[in-house]
């Protein structure tokens, strides 16, 4: 089968990083297509907390004001051990922009990103199965037999990235923990307030977060169990057992959660040392989002850093494409290829150490918060709980910049 007409940029995966990259390119006047294997946008994970770095990325993409209308701003955190005993510690946020945190349903965020793209940008039911070299181009083979030809290939296809494997990445490593997530809806409103409640200890870390007046997102991470992820009734009972010492208003959130909204998945991450020598970009191919830096959710930076990726990648590609247009239509193909390659190398260089930092910090925070050891527990509960909460905010103090330096 012959390839369809040549595309400038193909992005694989319509998740946060893929859509952010496509929207960034669109804002710069550069067309791309996004290949999504599912029949519609996927919203795995239910909700995510958006920190300072995410807001800077969304400002660059032109969607920040709309997203602000979708979630209440946090007033602060309440942190305490999951077992009865020590009193809770509270951290109130200043009103400055560095401390703006909101929890937004993932589907609403994806819809907002996709809604800003030109019609036809996203091609659903388009599963990548093979990548083939063709001179300075890449031939993208889909499961239905379609072949697409592209000048740039961007892998935003998640933890099991086909593009990542082509670049030489190994599969992410499973931790000894699983995450159980859910979302509760209250027709007459909930009483959680606008604070992020966190509980930890005894091998457990859990959180309860208001998205809006009627919706609460919650999660619980725990050492791996033999629970069947399809048996939602047993999963719900398991979580209720783990939070039995928490206040009644917290337990009522779980009791209100519909069984259909429960999901359980193993936590995975990319060993940070792999990024020291890995090819984040090679030739005219690169990866972003979970395809680049899968991490545990302990500092809430998976989705936020994916938006950073999208803005920075769009800027680097935009600089390369704009330079091409300035030289005119007769530009040598080799020169165009070299400039795109240099742009992707620039992107890779800017994301390597940021990714290593976030992966390492997230894994370490999760290890400390879920520790069962006597001395580690004492040290954490007495001295570390406030510091770990502060660290979550500190790691979000990153500004990806604007889409264009002009």
UniProtKB/Swiss-Prot annotation:
This protein's cofactor list reads:
FAD
EC code: 1.14.13.-
Q: Which SUPFAM superfamilies match?
A: FAD/NAD(P)-binding domain (SSF51905)
Free-text tissue specificity from the UniProt record: Expressed in seeds, seedlings, roots, leaves, flowers, pollen and siliques.
Q: Which InterPro entries match?
A: FAD-bd, FAD/NAD-bd_sf, MOase
Sequence similarity: Belongs to the 3-hydroxybenzoate 6-hydroxylase family.
Q: Does the keyword Membrane apply?
A: no
**Group of enzyme by EC:** oxidoreductase
* MF term (GO), any: monooxygenase activity
The protein's name in its UniProt record: Monooxygenase 3
Q: Which gene encodes it?
A: MO3
Which one Pfam family would you cite for this protein?
FAD_binding_3
How does this polypeptide assemble, per the annotation? Monomer.
Name the keywords, alphabetized.
Monooxygenase, Oxidoreductase
SS bonds (residue pairs):
none
């Amino acid at each position: 089968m012959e390839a369809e007409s040549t595309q400038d940029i193909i992005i694989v995966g319509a998740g946060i990083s893929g859509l952010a990259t496509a929207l960034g390119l669109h804002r710069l006047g550069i067309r791309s297509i996004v290949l999504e294997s599912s029949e519609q946008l996927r919203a795995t994970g239910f909700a995510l907390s958006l920190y300072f770095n995410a807001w800077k990325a969304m400002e660059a993409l032109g969607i920040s004001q709309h997203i602000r209308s979708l979630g209440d701003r946090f007033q602060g955190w309440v942190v305490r051990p999951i077992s009865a005993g020590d009193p809770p510690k509270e951290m109130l946020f200043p009103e400055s922009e560095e401390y703006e945190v909101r929890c937004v349903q993932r589907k609403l965020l994806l819809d907002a990103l996709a809604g800003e793209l030109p019609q036809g940008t996203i091609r659903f039911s388009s599963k990548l199965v093979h990548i083939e070299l063709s001179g300075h181009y890449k031939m993208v083979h889909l499961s239905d037999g379609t072949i697409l030809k592209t000048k740039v290939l961007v892998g935003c296809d998640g933890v099991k990235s086909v593009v990542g494997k082509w670049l030489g990445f190994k599969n992410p490593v499973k931790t000894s923990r699983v995450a159980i997530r859910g979302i509760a809806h209250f027709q007459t409103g909930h009483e959680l307030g606008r604070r992020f409640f966190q509980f930890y200890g005894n091998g457990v870390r859990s959180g309860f977060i208001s998205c809006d007046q009627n919706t609460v997102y919650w999660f619980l991470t725990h050492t791996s169990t033999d629970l069947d992820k399809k048996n939602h009734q047993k999963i719900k009972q398991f979580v209720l057992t783990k939070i039995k010492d928490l206040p009644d208003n917290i337990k009522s959130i779980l009791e209100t959660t519909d069984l259909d909204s429960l999901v359980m998945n193993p936590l995975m991450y990319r060993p940070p040392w792999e990024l020291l020598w890995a090819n984040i970009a090679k030739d005219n191919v690169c990866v972003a989002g979970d395809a680049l830096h899968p991490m545990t959710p302990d500092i809430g930076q998976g989705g936020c850093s994916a938006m950073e990726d999208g803005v920075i990648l769009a800027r680097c590609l935009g600089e390369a494409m704009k330079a091409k247009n300035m030289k005119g239509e007769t530009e040598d193909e080799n020169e165009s290829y070299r400039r795109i390659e240099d742009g992707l190398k620039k992107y890779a260089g800017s994301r390597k150490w940021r990714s290593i930092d976030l992966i390492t910090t997230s894994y370490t925070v999760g290890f400390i918060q879920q520790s069962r050891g006597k001395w580690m527990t004492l040290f954490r509960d007495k001295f570390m709980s406030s510091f770990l909460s502060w660290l979550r905010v500190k790691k979000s103090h990153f500004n990806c910049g604007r889409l264009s330096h002009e």
